[in-house]
Amino acid sequence: MPVKTPSPGDLEPIEKASQDELRALQLERLKWSVRHAYENVPHYRKAFDAKGVHPDDLKSLADLAKFPFTAKGDLRDNYPFGMFAVPREKVARVHASSGTTGKPTVVGYTLKDIDTWATVVARSIRASGGRAGDMVHIAYGYGLFTGGLGAHYGAEKLGCTVVPMSGGQTEKQIQLIQDFKPDIIMVTPSYMLTVLDEMERMGIDPHQTSLKVGIFGAEPWTQAMRAAMEARAGIDAVDIYGLSEVMGPGVANECIEAKDGPVIWEDHFYPEIIDPHTGEVLPDGSEGELVFTTLTKEAMPVIRYRTRDLTRLLPPTARSMRRMAKITGRSDDMLIIRGVNLFPTQVEELICKNPKLAPQYLLEVDKDGHMDTLTVKVEINPEANVGRHPEQKEALAKELQHDIKTFIGVSAKVHVCEPFAIERVTIGKAKRVVDRRPKE
């Protein structure tokens, strides 16, 4: 189906700016953000002082490399509001990513931040071919997860009609797509494939729907998956990138006319690529870990945040800003299961809270059709007074299954095993994860 390919008149001035204009704006905003963090966030004042740097030392964009990194652990160490740079009563909204019982990653937004977020998501939807008056079906989850509300406010900012469906209820999703006739769907790529499967099971030809564009994010997806979705649904499949700690969805987005990697909205987010082992800044085109510094966030500025995503920075094409290549992996052990970030250590903490279970476990990640599945195998504690009857194991499994869903936000199958059933590693690190999902 034809989509509305942007013309030069559709672009914001910053999307057409010269490199000199863009870099001058970035430096101005970077100086403000670094000083804002130093003067208002005790963590940053302490970290800058420990490294012997001061906001006055930032005289060029290259000088940012002198400043310390921020990691997810810093956010958790300052839970819940210790990273905020404004008084709590000035924070209009709080989101939180998945965490254990005590320490999710909390992010805050002022009203201006929410408007900025809506602006970059609106820009992302427009880059994907969306226009005012289009209907956008949002099947990202709503709530503490940033996906649903981030997409929602951006679509409204652009002037679109929003269908706030959220996730799940696949048959209902399809009914509304047929009845409301949306132009755009925003959803995880794996769930889109599930929707297409269900359409075909119901005898519905996906090519006959009103959908023209799918904006897919919250989990990595391959060019092969793009080709499959475009062929099966007759849509343009476009990649949106973001993370809660930096803003949410809308940090970067592909443009419909090129589909050659998400364009980073560099007027709000300054990217670097570093060697994940040494922290050295690498030249554009080199593969390494993606690092972001926010340039305009008021409530919670982040300086040199290590995303752990491995990618490359690519030169501009359809916009004046750089692009990022497809993410090839992560520099840590985080898994993304159906759009939810999960660390093996999170599961380990939940296991260790139950004295009837031993801290011997294995996470198995597979694909069931297009959906990620997680199976947790864990041993009974041999020192605990636990029976070996199947119903007792089943009760322990259900308890852990409930905890994983409640505190991490992902559904899992749990198998409780006899002591020593899980293979031990005698040399090197214990193998905690088996990821059988196909690689591109």
From Swiss-Prot:
It catalyses: 2-phenylacetate + ATP + CoA = phenylacetyl-CoA + AMP + diphosphate. Induction: Induced by phenylacetate, phenylacetaldehyde, 3-hydroxyphenylacetate, phenylalanine, phenylbutyric acid, DL-phenyllactate, phenylpyruvate, or 4-phenylbutyrate. Optimum pH is between 8 and 8.5, with a dramatic drop of activity (55%) at pH 9. Less than 10% activity is observed a pH 6, and half the maximal activity is measured at pH 7. GO terms for molecular function: ATP binding; phenylacetate-CoA ligase activity. It is an enzyme of class 6 (ligase). Pathway: Aromatic compound metabolism; phenylacetate degradation. Gene3D superfamilies: 3.30.300.30, N-terminal domain of ligase-like (3.40.50.12780). Inhibition of activity is observed in the presence of a 1 mM of the divalent cations zinc, copper, and nickel. InterPro entries: Adenylate-forming_Reductase, AMP-bd_C_sf, AMP-dep_Lig_C, AMP-dep_synth/lig_dom, ANL_N_sf, PA_CoA_lig_proteobact_actino, PA_CoA_ligase. One of its GO terms (biological process) is phenylacetate catabolic process. Keywords: ATP-binding, Ligase, Nucleotide-binding. Coiled coil: none annotated. Optimum temperature is 37 degrees Celsius. The enzyme is extremely labile, and the activity is totally lost within 48 h at 4 degrees Celsius. It holds the Pfam family AMP-binding_C_2. Its EC number is 6.2.1.30. The keyword ATP-binding applies. Catalyzes the activation of phenylacetic acid (PA) to phenylacetyl-CoA (PA-CoA). Involved in the phenylalanine metabolism. Monomer. Belongs to the phenylacetyl-CoA ligase family. This is Phenylacetate-coenzyme A ligase. It comes from Aromatoleum evansii (Azoarcus evansii).
